[in-house]
C-alpha cells in the first residue's frame, strides 16, 4: 500500500501547503491549563478560565496580526471558547485567513527500564477525538514527543517508541481530515555541543520518517516541527549562522522533499534569538525543498504577557508587543529580518525551563 489516499487527501495537501505559505507561520497557543498557570504566576495573574480566554482573545484579535499567521494551535478548551462579544474563536481565525489547529496528545509518561526517558500518550481514543475536532473546525493537529540528550540518551528504545507513536498519531489524523504536525522535540537541557545535538537530531528524524513511511503517512499532507540544532543549555552559545548551517544540514539529510514545510519550535530560546536563528536559516543559499517557518509559543508571547499583566488597560500595549513579534517572524521566514524590531520587556530573556512539560 502506498501513502494515504482517502477522501481527505486533496484537502490535507492543500492545508499543509497553506500553512507553509512564505511570510506566515504558526502561533502555538495550546499550553495546557497547568502550563499557562505557570506563565500567569510569573505575571501575578490568577489561572482561571476567564483570564485564559482573555489572553487568547487579546492575541487573536490583535489588529494586523493574523495576516502574518497561517495557523494557530489551540488547547481543547480554547477550541470551543468565544470572544466577549460571543464570536467563536474558530470563526475569528478563519475570517482572518488562519487555520485552527488542536493539540491532541495527552502528555508524556516515563518508559520503564530507561533513565527517565518518556513516550507520549493519547492514542486510545484519538480517532474519535480527531473526528470531533474536525467537526468543530480544526484542520490540523499537533503531537509532541520529547527526547533528551545524556551520556546514553536518547536510547534506541526511546527513539523507536517515539517515532512509532508519532507515526501512529499522524495516520490517524489524516484518516480524520487533520494535517498532522510531527513534533519530535530534543530538549536543549545539558552541556552537549552542537555536533552532538546535530547527530541526535539526524538520528531521531531518520527514525521518524522511516516510521511515517511504514504507516503510509501522506508526507505532502503533513508538517514537521523540530528543534533547531543548538548547543545544550549549559554550553557556550554559538552564532546564528552556525545554528542555521547545522540545522539545515540535518534536515537535508533526513527530511524528504515531499514535506511542504518545517515549522520550528523555539525550545526555550528568547523571542529575539528564535527569530534571528530562523532568519539565518532562510538566508542560507543551499538546497531547501521545504518552507522553513515557525510554530512558536513562548517566543511569540513572552513580551506580550509581560506588557499585559492581566490588566484590561494594558491590552493595546500588549497587542503592540504581539504584532511586533509576528511581523519579525514573518520577515524571518523570508530571510529579510534586519533585527530592528523594538524589543519589548522580556524579548531578550531566555525562556528555557529544564525538562519542559507542555
Curated annotation (Swiss-Prot):
EC number, UniProt record: 4.1.2.13
Location, primary (coarse class): cytoplasm
Highest taxon listed in the record's lineage: Eukaryota
Enzymatic reactions: beta-D-fructose 1,6-bisphosphate = D-glyceraldehyde 3-phosphate + dihydroxyacetone phosphate
Entry-linked Pfam families: Glycolytic
Keyword Magnesium attached: no
Annotated positions for site Necessary for preference for fructose 1,6-bisphosphate over fructose 1-phosphate: 358
UniProt pathway annotation: Carbohydrate degradation; glycolysis; D-glyceraldehyde 3-phosphate and glycerone phosphate from D-glucose: step 4/4
Annotated localization: Cytoplasm, Cytosol
Function according to Swiss-Prot or TrEMBL: Fructose-bisphosphate aldolase that plays a key role in glycolysis and gluconeogenesis.
GO molecular function terms noted in the UniProt entry: fructose-bisphosphate aldolase activity
Family of this protein: Belongs to the class I fructose-bisphosphate aldolase family.
Species for this entry: Oryza sativa subsp. japonica
Gene of this entry: FBA3
Residues reported in the UniProt entry to bind substrate: 39, 266-268, 298
GO cellular component, one term: cytosol
Subunit: Homotetramer.
Statement: the UniProt record of this protein carries the keyword Lyase: yes
Keywords for the protein's UniProt record, in alphabetical order: Cytoplasm, Glycolysis, Lyase, Schiff base
Protein name stated in the entry: Fructose-bisphosphate aldolase 3, cytoplasmic
Catalytic residues in the record: 183, 225
GO annotation terms (biological process): fructose 1,6-bisphosphate metabolic process; gluconeogenesis; glycolytic process
Amino acid at each position: 500500500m502506498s501513502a494515504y489516499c482517502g477522501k481527505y487527501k486533496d484537502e490535507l495537501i492543500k492545508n499543509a501547503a497553506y500553512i507553509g505559505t512564505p511570510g506566515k507561520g504558526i502561533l502555538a497557543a495550546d499550553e495546557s491549563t497547568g502550563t499557562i498557570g505557570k506563565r500567569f504566576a510569573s505575571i501575578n495573574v490568577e489561572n482561571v478560565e476567564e483570564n485564559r480566554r482573555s489572553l487568547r482573545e487579546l492575541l487573536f484579535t490583535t489588529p494586523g496580526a493574523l495576516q502574518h499567521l497561517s495557523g494557530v494551535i489551540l488547547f481543547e478548551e480554547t477550541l470551543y471558547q468565544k470572544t466577549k462579544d460571543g464570536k467563536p474563536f474558530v470563526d475569528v481565525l478563519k475570517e482572518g485567513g488562519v487555520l485552527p489547529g488542536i493539540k491532541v496528545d495527552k502528555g508524556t509518561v516515563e518508559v520503564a527500564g530507561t533513565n527517565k526517558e518518556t513516550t507520549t500518550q493519547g492514542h486510545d481514543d484519538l480517532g474519535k477525538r480527531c473526528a470531533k475536532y474536525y467537526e468543530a473546525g480544526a484542520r490540523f493537529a499537533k503531537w509532541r514527543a520529547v527526547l533528551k540528550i545524556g551520556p546514553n540518551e536518547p536510547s534506541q528504545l526511546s527513539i523507536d517508541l517515539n517515532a512509532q507513536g508519532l507515526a501512529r498519531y499522524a495516520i490517524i489524523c489524516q484518516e480524520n481530515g487533520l494535517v498532522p504536525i510531527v513534533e519530535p522535540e530534543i530538549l536543549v537541557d545539558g552541556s552537549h555541543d552542537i555536533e552532538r545535538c546535530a547527530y541526535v537530531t539526524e538520528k531521531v528524524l531518520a527514525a521518524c520518517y522511516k516510521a511515517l513511511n511504514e504507516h503510509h503517512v501522506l508526507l505532502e499532507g503533513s508538517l514537521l516541527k523540530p528543534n533547531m540544532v543548538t548547543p545544550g543549555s549549559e554550553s557556550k552559545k554559538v552564532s546564528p549562522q552556525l545554528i542555521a548551517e547545522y540545522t539545515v544540514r540535518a534536515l537535508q539529510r533526513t527530511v524528504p522533499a515531499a514535506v511542504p514545510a518545517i515549522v520550528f519550535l523555539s525550545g526555550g530560546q528568547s523571542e529575539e534569538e528564535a527569530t534571528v536563528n530562523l532568519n539565518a536559516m532562510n538566508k542560507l543559499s543551499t538546497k531547501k525543498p521545504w518552507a522553513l517557518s515557525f510554530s512558536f509559543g513562548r517566543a511569540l508571547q513572552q513580551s506580550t504577557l509581560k506588557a499585559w499583566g492581566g490588566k484590561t488597560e494594558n491590552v493595546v500595549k500588549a497587542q503592540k508587543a504581539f504584532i511586533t513579534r509576528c511581523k519579525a517572524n514573518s520577515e524571518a521566514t523570508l530571510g529579510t529580518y534586519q533585527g530592528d524590531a523594538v524589543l519589548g520587556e522580556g524579548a531578550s530573556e531566555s525562556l528555557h525551563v529544564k525538562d519542559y512539560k507542555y
